[in-house]
Amino acid sequence: MATIDTPVKTSVGGSGHAPVRAPRARRGRPGSRLWVKAVVALLLVVEVYPMIWMFLTSLKSNDDYLNNSTWSLPTTWEWSNYTEAWTTGNIGLYVQNSLLAVVPALALMLLLGTAAGFALQVMVWKGRSLTLLVFLAGMMVPPQMILLPLFTVYFQTGLSGTLWPLILTYTGTGLPLTVFMMATYYRSVPRELFEAATIDGAGILRAFWTISLPLVRNALLTVGLVQFFFIWNDLLIALTFTNNQDLRTIQVGLLNFTGDFGATQYGPLFAAICINVFGTLLIYLFLNQKVMKGLTSGALKG
């Protein structure tokens, strides 16, 4: 007759099987954890210290910067450097021009890229795979190769001397990456949602506006933020098409900042750099969590 073995309880000095202990989780050596913390601390210093130094330098007078140690604190805190950079250095105008070029280009890029990603991944039609390859091929074209032809086209069409060359060029150069990323995010959206909407009588436009856009809003925010940093930090395209001082973007303005003062004024110069750097950094810190959600949502298959 078959029997079932039962565990025998053991006592001190008793007989029977020794109790089996659950394996302990392997812990790293204290020395290795210390090295990891040291490396993280070093990377943090490398990233944060230049910003602290830049901010402190922006509060120094020109004599303080030239005559005292580079690592010293300001002898007098010159907060007026920010006012001087914003008004005399025209940083306020350059920020305005950057926003006037970036916001319309970003809106066009996201609208067209999202619609193209929806058409390439949700809608069924012949040639969509080839069309996606064409967009991917656009990512391989360096912007430097098309600047001269675009400059000729804009000059002949009378668009030179406006911000339209920047808006159109930013939209065209950023559209391939936007289409590719949005198509990747749409791939993770369950097809059953769109099939159910079609059965309920929803058309393509309604499915796009009311169903797809709410599902990919985190992806839209992520792609938009990535493209925003690319466009905001651009120097080459802006330098090519802004031949008027009143049309300079923030990066071109910083490049010519010394010329506007006639001589290098280090306090206002670093104040202008701080306005540019910390402004974009605050945007990222404010939207950090949504960006992380958007980065991971495209990797999950619904």
Would you name each region that the model predicts?
Residues G14-H17, R29, A263:
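Intrinsically disordered, low-complexity regions
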